[in-house]
Amino acid sequence: MEKIEKVLEILKEQGLDGIYITKEANVKYISGYPDELAYALICPQGNYLITDSRFTELAGQSCPDFEVVNWHNCGRSIPKAVESICVKSGIRRLGFEECFTTYDKYEEIHRLLSEHRIELTGTRNIVEELRYVKSEEEVANTRIACEIADKALEELVPYIKPGVTERELCARLEFSMKMHGAQDIGFETILISGAKTSLLHGKPGDRKVEEGDFVLVDYGAKYNGYISDTTRTFAVGHVSEQQKEIYELVREAQETGVRNMGPGIVASKPDAEIRKVVKKYEEYYYSGMGHGVGLDLHEEPFLGMYGTKIMQPGCVITMEPGIYIPGWGGVRIEDTVLITENGAETLTHFPKDLMIL
């Protein structure tokens, strides 16, 4: 209930009587609802979870502090369910997540509420600001996700060799995470090889790993909704001097980023230190250096040259500098990192020394 009380405080400060929450991760955070196709409405008069008949039993079990509203009983309409709650609760000014509400739903809700002279007001980042600093329970879930991911990658390594396809390696990795207790994969796995490793979000395909390749693995496990995020780059068979040079630069850059992270640090500061390390290849360092991770893969704080957030104990971030040379390939090394009272603790522990397989 502490989360809800904080939301109600923010609503009061903003002159709102309630808020309609549509972003899936925000609904889970505020209610505990573990699935999809549910929406929350929070107001001083009560907490409501709006879903349909397929999910009402699950909602009742997982959200004991919420009244479950089946929109099938409200004219089979989500907007009409929102209208019914607002009228019943005496809401005069309702906030909604303007970045996560479709225009057609906004129009219909606005039309229905206008008939009752209820104002509909766009809001941003009310729940996200609460998610910025993780609770002990959230950190514990993230730790387990990281442990699962580490074990799965360790099991994958013997299979990274010439002749195996990216798709096969990806399948083995994802299966291993689930066998070790992952609720699901954290996000779509990036497992690419050869020149494809310059693609920041390349997709695994039927390409077979070859001697002299880099193999880049960017993956995560999900546990109780919380996501880990790790990247490691492996060499196969042999490496050139340039491959060694770039790998070691990226490793030094990544470790420099973690060393320069801690409470009170602005999100842009480590980027300047990383750029000093990769100066020779700076034109190929064009991705962000990291981001927050939790219920979403990418969430506040966003790290990089233009980052403005101040790190606080309990923030969970990634540190993922990379060098990407089109037509040649790329290297990325990434860890999930917890901001602590005294600095930064790396939660993913797979070795970062260059492994030649």
Put a short name on every predicted segment.
Residues 1-357:
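Active-site neighborhoods and metal-handling regions in enzymes and metal-associated proteins
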